[in-house]
From Swiss-Prot:
Pfam family, one: GTP1_OBG
Record bears the keyword rRNA-binding: no
Native species: Treponema denticola (strain ATCC 35405 / DSM 14222 / CIP 103919 / JCM 8153 / KCTC 15104)
Cofactor(s) required, per the database record: Mg(2+)
UniProt keyword Cell membrane present: no
Encoding gene per record: obg
Keywords, comma-separated and alphabetical: Cytoplasm, GTP-binding, Hydrolase, Magnesium, Metal-binding, Nucleotide-binding
Recorded GO MF terms: GTP binding; GTPase activity; magnesium ion binding
CDD domains named among the record's database cross-references: Obg (cd01898)
Family named by the database record: Belongs to the TRAFAC class OBG-HflX-like GTPase superfamily. OBG GTPase family.
Location of the region described as Disordered in the Swiss-Prot/TrEMBL record: 360-382
Name of this chain's protein: GTPase Obg
Length: 382
């Protein structure tokens, strides 16, 4: 059986910070050099990287535990430890991170097609003993251990991002329509449930525009109660700009088909059921279908209904224009999203405008260094 990897449970951890060092300066003619232990390095971060060329989560099936490297320990002469290597997990666009216990969404990447996002920060490195020198303790033998990293179990869920989602009963012609308009080559055969996994195709409009079309397995009556394959994959068209309902005119239940599909979508998600749509009546080349097409338009007068025949290539240009129009309409009404800041990095740091930056160099036979001083601009009192 063909399996589509659209969900995976994994354990992720950031790295532990390196331990601070206890060391003392030991040089000739410097009998009491004082502490010189450096700080530990920061642990590596756990990072998700969105890659536009990925389509499934199959790579997460083979490995379930991901951990960033720990930071290196501090060393003498106030040398800091090495920062731990980050752990980067590649993901396809449209992923959502969920809590396995509550099912709540922790992080939604939205429509991002590329970029890196820190999910777990590495632990801070521990202080070396040079931080603990005081007027009464000139040779401290104290250092701090590195901060522990974070560990979480999460569910990574993939929701395919498409402009148009194709919805219909098995053998309604969804895969054939996808094959005609795009370079996708889904399996096409004259028996139900030929499509077992979602398929994506790209309808090329011009040099700057594409329309992404998603084909999911056929939906049966009672799908919301677990019958058939299609209901499991409805989440993959939940983010689509609009829906195309395909109704087979050669099926005797063609008049009930639209109502059944609407009912199953509403049972799954009211938001999905309210999306803009067009109705495509297929197999218009078969006997008695032209009369049925007229009856269908009379039965659903408030919806746009287009008739097509893939065999004779009737009405396909009108369907193409309808897909482009629907995608363009939703793009214009799409709200502008703020840039994703999943870990709140921008809120954890204080920013300041600097009024003056100065430094003083010290360079003699044994030492080289610099003292840097920063002065902050003060806000005027109101």
């Amino acid at each position: 059986m063909v399996k589509f990897a659209d969900e995976s449970k994994i354990r992720v951890s950031s790295g532990k910070g390196g331990n601070g060092c206890i060391a003392f300066r030991r040089e000739k003619y410097v009998p009491m050099g004082g502490p010189s232990g450096g700080d530990g390095g920061r642990g590596g971060d756990l990072i998700f990287e969105i890659r536009r060329n990925m389509r499934t989560l199959v790579h997460l099936r083979h490995k379930r535990v991901y951990k960033a490297k720990n930071g290196g320990g501090g060393e003498g002469s106030q040398r800091f430890g090495k920062k731990g290597d980050d752990c980067i997990i590649p993901l396809p666009p449209g992923c959502v991170i969920k809590d396995p216990e509550t099912g709540k969404t922790i992080l939604d990447f939205g429509d991002a097609e590329e970029g890196r996002f820190v999910f777990l920060k590495g632990g801070n490195g521990g202080w070396g003993n040079c931080h603990f020198k005081t007027s009464t303790n000139q040779a401290p033998k104290t250092a701090l251990p590195g901060q522990e990293g974070e560990t979480r179990e999460i569910i990574v869920e993939l929701n395919i991002i498409a402009d148009i989602g194709l919805v219909g009963f098995p053998n309604a012609g969804k895969s054939s329509l996808l094959d005609y308009f795009t370079n996708a080559r889904p399996k096409i055969a004259p028996y139900p449930f030929t499509t077992k996994i979602p398929n994506l195709g790209v309808l090329r409009v011009d040099e700057e525009r594409d329309v992404i079309i998603a084909d999911i397995p056929g939906i049966l009556e009672g799908a919301s109660e677990g019958i058939g394959l299609g209901i499991r994959f409805l989440k993959h068209i939940a983010r689509s700009a609009g829906l195309a309902f395909l109704i087979d005119l050669s099926d005797d239940n063609y008049l009930r088909a639209y109502d059944i599909l609407c009912k199953e979508l509403e049972s799954y998600s009211k938001e999905l059921a309210q999306k803009k749509r067009i109705i495509i009546a297929t197999k218009l080349d078969l006997p008695d279908t032209k009369e049925r097409f007229t009856e269908l338009k009379n039965a659903i007068p408030d919806q746009e209904i287009l008739g097509i025949s893939l065999y004779n290539e009737w009405g396909l240009e009108e369907v193409k224009k309808a897909f482009i129009r629907l995608a363009d309409e939703m793009q214009k009404t799409k709200p502008q999203k703020e840039s994703l800041d999943p870990y709140g990095q921008n809120k954890n740091f204080m920013t300041a405008e600097l009024d003056d930056v100065s430094y003083e160099e010290k360079n003699d036979d044994e030492h080289f260094g610099a003292t840097v001083s920063l002065s902050r601009k003060r806000k005027p009192k109101k």
